[in-house]
Amino acid sequence: MLFLALGGPWAAGLRLSGKRTALWASSALRDPRAAVSRAASCRGSSGRVGGTGLSAAAPVLRRVRAQIPVCWERGVRCSHTQLDKSEDGRLIYTGNLARTVFGVKCFSYSTSLISLAFLPYIFAQNNVIFGSLPLQILFYGTIGSFTVITPALLHFLTKGYVIRLYHEARTDTYKAITYSVVLSEKSTVFHQNDVKIPNSTHVFTTFYAKTKSLLVNPALFPNPEDYNHLMGYDKPFTFDLEEASEKKQLKEEK
């Protein structure tokens, strides 16, 4: 009160310092970097008054810097765990042709439905459009191929394409997601011991899960160790010549 009543230079410095401290605190909440640069410029220009404002605003800056990264770190950590882990296990594979397969099958099914919708009209105009029997056979064969054969062939070729693959490490089980006939997601659960590698190379089969053929791309596994464990390549390789010779002798005796 004495300083304010005297109106001396100290009182003016205190009033100016208080105003600048409030400005620094408010700007620090909006943009910490701008507040630091502004405080440094004020300190260089005004000397003692700027230094007082910077020292008063420093705890606010430290508090903002200490709090924001912690919140970001928690948010990133939570989102990371939610994406990687689910009820089916850990996502280890995602097919890059899932949308392509879905789109091609949808187009094939739509053309089949359109052909079936126009069949009554075509049957009604049969005698008018086609006069000869060979033309009728050719026309109906073409419609039949687009209506039945093409969707069936596409489903046969893509029924084993794996959209997503999950792995449960505790039970060492896998869950493969594929497309069904009606384009709904179908799950196949199998153990690692159920995986069988075909003796010869197949275009649309990478391995057999029990009796179901599945197709995956080894290059799309983010972790190559997951693919090696799936195929059983991480197991120790044992080859007993005596057992092989005994089996061969038994076959020859039979």
From Swiss-Prot:
Subunit structure: Homooligomer. Interacts (homooligomer form) with ATP5MC1; this interaction facilitates the oligomer formation of subunit c/ATP5MC1 (c-ring) and the c-ring membrane insertion and also protects ATP5MC1 against intramitochondrial proteolysis. Interacts with the core subunits TMEM126B, NDUFAF1, ECSIT and ACAD9 of the MCIA complex. Interacts with ATP5MC3, TMEM242 and TIMMDC1.
Function of the molecule: Scaffold protein that participates in the c-ring assembly of mitochondrial ATP synthase (F(1)F(0) ATP synthase or complex V) by facilitating the membrane insertion and oligomer formation of the subunit c/ATP5MC1 through its interaction. Therefore, participates in the early stage of mitochondrial ATP synthase biogenesis and also protects subunit c/ATP5MC1 against intramitochondrial proteolysis. In addition, binds the mitochondrial proton-transporting ATP synthase complexes I and may play a role in the stability of its membrane-bound subassemblies.
Species of the source: Bos taurus
GO cellular component, one term: mitochondrial membrane
Residue intervals annotated with topology Mitochondrial intermembrane: 134-136
Source organism, top-level taxon: Eukaryota
Keyword annotations of the record: Membrane, Mitochondrion, Mitochondrion inner membrane, Transit peptide, Transmembrane, Transmembrane helix
GO molecular function: mitochondrial proton-transporting ATP synthase complex binding
Family annotation (InterPro entries): TMEM70, TMEM70/TMEM186/TMEM223
The protein, known as: Transmembrane protein 70, mitochondrial
Originating gene: TMEM70
Subcellular location: Mitochondrion inner membrane
Membrane topology reported for the UniProt record: Multi-pass membrane protein
Transit peptide per record: 1-78
Record field: transmembrane: 113-133, 137-157
Mitochondrial matrix-side segments: 79-112, 158-254
Pfam families for the chain: TMEM70 (PF06979)
GO BP annotations, alphabetical order: mitochondrial proton-transporting ATP synthase complex assembly; protein complex oligomerization
Family under the similarity heading: Belongs to the TMEM70 family.
